[in-house]
Amino acid sequence: MLYTVSHSPYHCDLSALLRLATSEDDILLLQDGVIAALKESEILKLLLNNPASLFVLEDDVIARGLVGQISDNATLISYTHFVDLTLRHQQQLAW
């Protein structure tokens, strides 16, 4: 399953997502969801303790002026890689 998080982590229930995600899943932070990948944030720690892989859309990081503030533990990806993730996962859930 591909979980896409496009809302600020302060305006959505990420704890519910984390209860569902498994090691076979990917989580993609995009739009305002990229805030969840800020270095040293408590939300980031929760995401990194989850077995799912964590990706962050680089264009949205740049658009929000957050370059250099995103954790190195989150993988920055391009729109091309985003498309690859959608092809890899038959099921997707927007969060």
UniProtKB/Swiss-Prot annotation:
Subunit structure: Heterohexamer, formed by a dimer of trimers. The hexameric TusBCD complex contains 2 copies each of TusB, TusC and TusD. The TusBCD complex interacts with TusE.
UniProt record similarity statement: Belongs to the DsrH/TusB family.
Coiled coil: none
Record-linked Pfam families: DsrH
GO cellular component, one term: sulfurtransferase complex
Stored NCBIfam families: PRK13510.1, sulf_tusB_dsrH
Gene3D superfamilies named among the record's database cross-references: DsrEFH-like (3.40.1260.10)
Protein name (Swiss-Prot/TrEMBL): Protein TusB
Classification via InterPro entries: DsrEFH-like, Sulphur_relay_TusB, Sulphur_relay_TusB/DsrH
UniProt keyword annotations, A-Z: Cytoplasm, tRNA processing
GO terms for biological process, alphabetical: tRNA wobble position uridine thiolation
Name of the gene encoding the protein in the UniProt record: tusB
Stated role: Part of a sulfur-relay system required for 2-thiolation of 5-methylaminomethyl-2-thiouridine (mnm(5)s(2)U) at tRNA wobble positions.
Source organism per UniProt: Yersinia pseudotuberculosis serotype O:3 (strain YPIII)
Intracellular or extracellular location(s): Cytoplasm
